[in-house]
Design a protein with these regions (language model features):
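Active-site-adjacent loop and "lid" segments of alpha/beta metabolic enzymes
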Residues: 16-60, 79
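Hydrophobic residues within beta-strands of alpha/beta enzymes
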Residues: 1-2, 65-66
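Active-site-adjacent beta->alpha loops and helix N-cap segments on the catalytic face
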Residues: 4-25, 71-80
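Conserved functional loop/turn residues at catalytic and ligand-binding sites
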Residues: 61, 69
Length: 80
């Protein structure tokens, strides 16, 4: 497991091919708070920013992602 997730996209990518075990990323509470606060201030579109952050983790090699946005992200993906 790699945490915090977003600052270590390069680590996720490097680990991806080195081990034959599932790789998980944990989007910690600080990352959640950062996105939530910026969205509340109108600085970004919460849905787009959150989904992009999760897609970035997946592209970097995470096979599973633990996030405080899990329920919202599931709803957003279902609506898409």
């Amino acid at each position: 497991m790699v945490k915090p997730a977003l600052p270590y996209l390069d680590v996720l990518s490097a680990l991806k091919g080195r081990f034959a075990k599932p790789l998980f990323a944990y989007q910690v509470s600080g990352e959640y708070a950062m996105l939530k606060a910026a969205a509340l201030k109108g600085w970004l579109d919460e849905r787009r920013a959150v989904l992009e952050s999760l897609f970035a983790l997946r592209r970097a090699g995470a096979q599973g992602i633990l996030t405080y946005y899990a329920l919202e992200a599931a709803r957003w993906l279902k609506e898409a």
